[in-house]
Amino acid sequence: MYFLVDAARKILFGWSAKCGCSHIKRIFYFLKNRKENTIIHGDKDYNKLPRDIEKYTTIIISRNPYERIVSGFLDKYKPSGSFRHLWKHDTITFAKFVEELVRGDWNMVEKHHFTPQTTEQFDENIMLSKCIKCYDIKDIDYTYIEELYNVKIPETILNKREGHERKNYSESIDHLVCDLEMTQYYNFNVNSKCFYNEELKNKVHNFYKNDFIFFSELGLDYTTPGV
């Protein structure tokens, strides 16, 4: 997790890769500068917590770790994905991907998009914030955020598609795909729960254990893959 800091208004946003970060950055820079910003990725996004965190209202945008890894796997490791070149095996399955992930050496699995949300610049002192809100990316309270800034977020920002979204395909799969080569199901709608048998669920839970604990403390129950 990194932080977008509005020092003037004492508001910060916590973001992590594959947790709607492009969407959140667009919102933040509009609210901070009162204009739509087309440049949303850069060094200015990777901040630590402010030293006077107790004066800040903090908004964290999170994602179910079970869903986040599936989303990253399908987006970044598809045949044309930006990190597929890191994969050294002849075939790619979700089960094998998780195996490489939990090894933790980050040779074949790109770290920034798959490290736990409670790593990078995450700091437990965030709990000292004057006020802290944590929203799942599917359930962001935009009204609350607009009220903090006393401004309406344009629909062009709220509805903008960033290009990483999965398409809605004409056919769906409702059986386990964890041991299948990705190309066998990529062009189908596949629910996140279809990627998990009990063994994989336990491996992913243990790897992202601190995420599950932290978000549970903030009222989000991520103990099962999406349905």
List the predicted regions and their residue ranges:
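Membrane-interface amphipathic segments in extracytoplasmic regions
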Residues: 1-227
